[in-house]
Amino acid sequence: NFDGLLRVIRDDAGILLASLNPETVLNTLDECPVAVLKEHPLSILVLMRSMFNWRQIPKMMELKQLLLTAIEERPEIPPEERGNLLGECDLIMSFLCYNDISAMSRLHRSASEQMSHPAISIQNTGGWTFGSPSVLMMFYRGPGELAGELAEMDECMPHYYKITNGHGQGAEKIMHAEAAFMQGNFTDAEIALESAYAQIAGNGQENMALCCDFLACR
């Protein structure tokens, strides 16, 4: 029952899917009729995100094209729903630009402009840091670029929060705190760190709290 399977994938938003063997999922997808898959655009979005997590980028791109085709073939889709689908597609594609904040930000803004509700493929209780103990470590790219990268984080994260229910909240403040610490501005670092702690308090995003804790220990 591929219809039922795709509905479960949509409702689960990829949480249980992540515990499955990627090869099993890929084999099942190969067996699923394309016409059936096209009827479940939200499930395609969840699968795209899962393919990114599994580093199955060619399959991710194949699913993206299938999504765009499915949307194009269904002119009866309301404009708001169409915007949410295309916006979430942009959001998922932004992960391919990691760790170029400028490129990611362009796609986050595009998604934010199109979407009227939060993404279904990203849960705000899920990890944001991909296991990294440092936001600065994730996004600092080269000498002389730090000020621009901090400004980009300040600009892009509100757009990202809007479409993910605050996933990764506090990231820009943590990066500011880490940057100030590395520059020897310890008072500024402590102020930014406390601001980050206040922003993430009680939201269940332990990965962000751990980044704060690692900096506090230093």
Model-predicted regions and their roles:
Residues 1-53, 59, 63:
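Extended alpha-helical scaffolding segments used for macromolecular assembly and cargo binding
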Residues 216-218:
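Long, low-complexity regulatory tails in eukaryotic proteins
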